[in-house]
């Protein structure tokens, strides 16, 4: 599994349309608030042309992409942090994800009602972010109350945690995002168990009309907000993506050519999510299967091996490693080996994105 990204937004911004296109799950996207109550989950393959290039050389029995999970979380509304509009359940569902894809409506359409009567991305973002911040404020205050007693008793870990929580508190009181705070890795680790919603990596998915990718003041608003808090923006037209998702490969390529698109916008959403979580891919390439594996950036060779099986990590000896570029240039493992491009990497090797690896282990 790659990662779990929760898709959030106000009702009627195009969340379920986007989710349907992402997963081809075909859940009902009714023009009505709260048509999604239980979160719908879809597992989506990670688009990576490198996998096909490797398969062309190796000719395996099958190819397996890495995947990620998208969760369509029901439309949040003002007051969700106090339980309005089924809010408590929604917030719990978001808490269980690793990242947030916040869909924002950046198009006019009289046939699709807007919950507040007008299209205003800045207001929409503020409503959602305020609800998330209020939920986090409640979590933070409870944690401070709980940790204070231990800290007074001289508990070092409790003191460290309390210091971080007291840094977070004023930010949340002002409905600010914790991800905009400059927290160190140690500080984040101290409060990780609390699963703060506003600390989760977030991308804004700007849902635009077919002609709304340029000269769109709504889109500009979203970009401005994202820049201030260090988030990314991915513009897509959910309606077009839904059409593309229904086509077979040949029709899809033709349709995208007509629209002047190089690839479905959803590929950008998936890749942005991947990057957001600091993930990368390595490959295994054998005649039985060519496969992509997800690891965090900075993972060592044994940690990468452990993704396949824990025994590979426990008994790790070394990793026969070829860069993706060399594997393609020299037409596979044998050619790369003959050209002196296969390396034997040890326990301290930091895996690079695209490495083609074969692990030697002994248990």
Curated annotation (Swiss-Prot):
Tagged with keyword Signal: no
Pfam families cross-referenced by the UniProt entry: MMR_HSR1 (PF01926), YchF-GTPase_C (PF06071)
Cross-referenced InterPro entries: ATPase_YchF/OLA1, Beta-grasp_dom_sf, G_OBG, GTP-bd, P-loop_NTPase, TGS, TGS-like, TGS-like_dom_sf
Endpoints of the signal sequence: none
The OBG-type G domain, residue ranges: 3-256
Transmembrane segments: none
This protein's record includes keyword ATP-binding: yes
Residues holding ATP: 12-17
Keywords linked to the UniProt accession: ATP-binding, Magnesium, Metal-binding, Nucleotide-binding
An annotated GO BP: response to oxidative stress
Domain of life: Bacteria
One GO location term (cellular component): cytoplasm
UniProt note on regulation of activity: ATPase activity is stimulated by potassium and other monovalent cations. Stimulation is maximal in the presence of K(+), followed by NH(4)(+), Rb(+), Na(+) and Cs(+).
Cofactor names: Mg(2+)
Location of the TGS domain: 278-361
Cysteine pairs bridged by disulfides in the record: none
List of residues binding Mg(2+): 16, 36
Molecular-function GO terms, alphabetical: ATP binding; ATP hydrolysis activity; enzyme inhibitor activity; GTP binding; metal ion binding; protein homodimerization activity; ribosomal large subunit binding; ribosome binding
Assembly information from the UniProt record: Monomer.
The protein's role, per its UniProt record: ATPase that binds to both the 70S ribosome and the 50S ribosomal subunit in a nucleotide-independent manner. Does not hydrolyze GTP.
Name of protein: Ribosome-binding ATPase YchF
Organism: Escherichia coli (strain K12)
Taxonomic path: Bacteria, Pseudomonadati, Pseudomonadota, Gammaproteobacteria, Enterobacterales
């Amino acid at each position: 599994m790659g990662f779990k990204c929760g898709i959030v937004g106000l009702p009627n911004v195009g969340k379920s349309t986007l989710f349907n296109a992402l997963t081809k799950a075909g859940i009902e996207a009714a023009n009505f608030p709260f048509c999604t109550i239980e979160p719908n989950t879809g597992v989506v393959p990670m688009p990576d042309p490198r996998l096909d290039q490797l398969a062309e050389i190796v000719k395996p029995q099958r190819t397996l992409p890495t995947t990620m999970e998208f969760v369509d979380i029901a439309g949040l509304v003002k007051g969700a942090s106090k339980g309005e509009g089924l809010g408590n359940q929604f917030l719990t569902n978001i808490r269980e994800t690793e990242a947030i894809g916040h869909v924002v409506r950046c198009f006019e359409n009289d046939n699709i009602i807007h919950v507040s009567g007008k299209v205003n991305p800045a207001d929409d973002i503020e409503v959602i972010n305020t609800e998330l911040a209020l939920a986090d404020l409640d979590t933070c205050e409870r944690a401070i109350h709980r940790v204070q007693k231990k800290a007074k008793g001289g508990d070092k870990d409790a003191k460290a945690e309390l210091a971080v929580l007291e840094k977070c508190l004023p930010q949340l009181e002002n409905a600010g995002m914790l991800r905009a705070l400059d927290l160190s890795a140690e500080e984040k680790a101290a409060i990780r168990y609390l699963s703060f919603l506003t600390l989760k990596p977030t991308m804004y998915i700007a849902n635009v009309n077919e002609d709304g990718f340029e000269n769109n003041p709504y889109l500009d608003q979203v970009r401005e907000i994202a820049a201030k808090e260090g988030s990314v923006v991915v513009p897509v037209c959910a309606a077009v993506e839904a059409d593309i998702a229904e086509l077979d490969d040949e029709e899809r390529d033709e349709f995208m050519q007509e629209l002047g698109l190089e690839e479905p916008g959803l590929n950008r959403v998936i890749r942005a999510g991947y990057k957001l979580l600091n993930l990368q891919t390595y490959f295994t390439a054998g005649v039985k299967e060519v496969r992509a594996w997800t690891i965090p950036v900075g993972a060592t060779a044994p940690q990468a091996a452990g993704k396949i099986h824990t025994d590979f990590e426990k008994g790790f000896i070394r990793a026969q490693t070829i860069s993706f570029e060399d594997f393609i240039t020299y037409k596979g493992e044998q050619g790369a080996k003959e050209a002196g491009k296969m390396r034997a990497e040890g326990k301290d090797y930091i895996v690079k994105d695209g490495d083609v690896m074969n692990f030697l282990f002994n248990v």
